[in-house]
Curated annotation (Swiss-Prot):
The lineage of its organism: Archaea, Methanobacteriati, Methanobacteriota, Methanomada group, Methanococci. Catalyzes the attachment of O-phosphoserine (Sep) to tRNA(Cys). Belongs to the class-II aminoacyl-tRNA synthetase family. O-phosphoseryl-tRNA(Cys) synthetase subfamily. It comes from Methanococcus maripaludis (strain DSM 14266 / JCM 13030 / NBRC 101832 / S2 / LL). It is an enzyme of class 6 (ligase). This is O-phosphoserine--tRNA(Cys) ligase. The gene is sepS.
Length: 537
């Protein structure tokens, strides 16, 4: 905490001095917790749900009222709506199926099988029979069967499961049997039911919308088709409603998403639930795929289908594919990857990789950590001392009553060289998925590498870690280790850097995996010629 009064007094006396000196009160974060190794964490929404939300608001702005339609539709309704074409539509529907409930009796043979397992059946026979009967009748759920059998026979549930498996094989190898119920393949199946019921309850005209899931038994999923998708559908019922309402609604919706590039094309499909010549497809342009994508279909329901549902006014329906719209808005080339990114490759960008390059060893104690800063500054200042030469840094640490004098000696004995090698100021960058050490200046860099390194510096993400920074942390963490183990001297010698570990750096496994699988590189080569001798007294 700041000593506020002292600071204010200092500032009153000499503002400039106080302003500069109080700078040290703002403690910098330690290197592994510094930017870009820290990254803001925020939640992320799904593009499909975002589009659904935007479409809901768009419909509401246009005066529509929200409804939820039945998801499960009896095939009879499809016949009612499509007439002779129903089979073609049902072909794209999923039917709901379930496992049959076998009629299993408690024969003498079964009783003796249970008794062979060491269980007395006689006094429990009746309750066991009741359970089997209840299951057949549907009063007992399948997932309660084992528990109920175990309770009836007063045995453990493990034994109950064994009996089910060994004595009642009828429950195994059951094959699902289809019902006449289907999962809706488009919202229309539900609109007929909803509009029909509202006819006597709601004054005309009315404008309804629903954004919900539909299911299609597509032969195969592809870049614009999924087995399950969302339809943002609406129905307008009332005298005078016609195809022009469809065009206006399509424009109203799409223009709220910023689309100006769309076209209406009469649908070749000519579904029997639409009035002839009203079924129209809406296409929007996908800039990345460079093709027109069908995003919606609209039409006026046929008076034949409407009459069967007791509806005696025109109803215009428009069904817009949410995923298709999300694909175009978010510039996704494949609906499968957009909806289920978790099943596809996840690429870390350079910013992500930069947050994963960290110092391997960093001293824990503040005094030793702070010495690193001093060490780095001295090394940078004296890096070009002509050899033979040495740079000595001395420091005394107090731990309770004990004092430790530390002498760090950085030296170069060979004649005619510099104290430190030329790559000492190289900084680690992440560029195009590569982790690279980039020199301060490009003088003397081979022509073939220049372009790549220059681009790395201007377009890549800087980690803010130079070789000398990481190496000095290596020296000070070794010093900390020496204190703990009572070692009195040690040496650090790094002539040429070849890998991250040579300069006390590490990288997260997921970044490393990506670098390897994408044929990217970690190139931190370079001569640093660091020789250090440390003595502790
Ligand atoms: P397509 O010709 O592209 O297969 P469709 O003519 O069968 O589509 P409609 O029955 O008119 O589609 O459905 C209305 C809208 O629902 C389509 O314009 C489309 O945006 C969307 N849609 C239909 N089927 C799928 C699907 N399998 N996956 C994603 N969206 C779909």
């Amino acid at each position: 905490m700041f000593k506020r009064e002292e600071i204010i007094e200092m500032a009153n006396k000499d503002f400039e001095k106080a302003w500069i000196e109080t700078k040290d009160l703002i403690k910098a974060k330690k290197i592994n917790e510094s930017y870009p190794r820290i990254k803001p964490v925020f939640g992320k929404t799904h593009p499909v749900n975002d589009t659904i939300e935007n479409l809901r608001q768009a419909y509401l702005r246009m005066g529509f009222e929200e409804y939820i339609n039945p998801v499960i539709v009896d095939e009879r309704d499809i016949y009612k709506q499509f007439g002779p074409e129903a089979m073609a539509v049902l072909d794209r529907c999923f039917y709901l199926a379930g496992l049959p409930r076998p009629d299993v009796g408690l024969s003498d043979e079964k009783i003796s099988q249970i008794e062979k397992l060491g269980i007395k059946v006689s006094e429990h026979k009746e309750s066991l029979q009741k359970i089997l009967h209840g299951y057949k009748k549907g009063t007992l759920d399948g997932d309660d069967l084992v528990l109920e059998i175990s309770n009836a026979l007063e045995i453990s549930s493990e034994m109950g499961l064994k009996i089910l498996e060994d004595v009642f094989p009828e429950f195994k190898d059951l094959t699902a049997v289809s019902s006449k119920l289907t999962l809706r393949s488009h919202m229309t199946s539900g609109w007929f039911l909803t509009v029909s019921d509202l006819m006597n309850k709601k004054p005309l005209p009315f404008k309804l919308f629903s954004i919900d899931r539909c299911f299609r038994r597509e032969q195969k999923e592809d870049k614009s088709h999924l087995m399950t998708y969302h339809s943002a559908s609406c129905a307008i019922a009332g005298e005078g409603v016609d195809i022009n309402d469809g065009k206006a609604i399509a424009e109203g919706l799409l223009s709220q998403f910023g689309f100006t590039n769309f076209k209406f094309i009469p649908d070749e499909k000519k579904s029997k639930y639409y009035t002839p010549e009203t079924q129209t497809e809406v296409y929007a342009y996908h800039p990345k795929l460079k093709e027109w994508l069908e995003v919606a279909t609209f039409g006026v329901y046929s008076p034949v289908a409407l009459s069967k549902y007791g509806i005696d006014v025109p109803v215009m329906n428009l069904g817009l594919g949410v995923e298709r719209l999300a694909m175009i808005s978010g510039n996704f080339a494949d609906v499968r990857e957009m909806v289920y990114p978790q099943f596809y490759e996840h690429k870390l960008n350079d910013r992500n990789v930069a947050s994963m390059v960290k110092l391997d060893k960093v001293p824990v104690m503040d005094e030793i950590y702070d010495l690193t800063k001093e060490l780095i500054e001295s090394c940078v200042k004296n890096k070009d001392l002509k050899s033979p030469c040495e740079l000595a840094i001395e420091k005394t640490f107090s731990f309770g009553k004990t004092k430790k004098n530390v002498k760090i000696n950085i030296f170069e004995k060979e004649e005619g060289k510099n104290l430190l090698g030329p790559s000492i100021l190289n900084e680690i960058y992440v560029y195009d998925g590569n982790v690279i050490g980039i020199p301060e200046s490009f003088d003397g860099v081979k022509e073939e590498f220049k372009d790549f390194l220059e681009k790395g510096k201007s377009e890549g993400v800087a980690t803010g870690i130079r070789y000398i920074d990481a190496l000095c942390f290596k020296i000070t963490s070794k010093l900390e280790e020496a204190f703990v183990s009572n070692t009195t001297e040690f040496k650090v010698k790094v002539p040429i850097v070849r890998s991250l570990s040579d300069i006390n750096l590490k990288i997260d496994d997921i970044a490393l995996k990506q670098i390897m699988s994408k044929n990217k590189v970690i190139d931190v080569r370079g001569p640093v010629f660091l020789n250090v001798e440390v003595k502790i007294e």
